[in-house]
Amino acid sequence: MSKTKMTEEKILTKHPLGKSGKNLSMQTYDLFKHAIQSLLRDRELTHNELMGRLKKNLKGKFSGNISWYGETVKLDLEARKIIERTNSKPQKYRLKS
């Protein structure tokens, strides 16, 4: 007997403060991860700038709540030390070098 529906690959996200992560589909995670990394490639952005550009870039490409998924993946990327917050006021995000 074969499965008619393949099980979707998932990832359990991490949180920089050790809080519990969220289970996301790998496809959704990768979409947001690449979008965030692309936005931060040559610049530092505040939280509002990052989320605003993420919404603009993914509108029409993703039907879920872009802010929620964006925040979840951003926190995961911080926990994995892929991106970091600056000490500036307001805080900005950047790729870790």
Residue map of PLM features:
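Short amphipathic alpha-helical interaction segments
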Residues: 62-79
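Short acidic, hydrophobic short linear motifs in intrinsically disordered regions
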Residues: 44-61
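Short, cationic-aromatic polyanion-contact patches
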Residues: 88-97
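Positively charged, polyanion-binding regions of nucleic-acid-associated proteins
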Residues: 25-44, 74-78
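Short amphipathic alpha-helical interaction patches enriched in hydrophobic/aromatic residues
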Residues: 40, 58-62, 81
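A short, conserved structural fragment
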Residues: 78-88
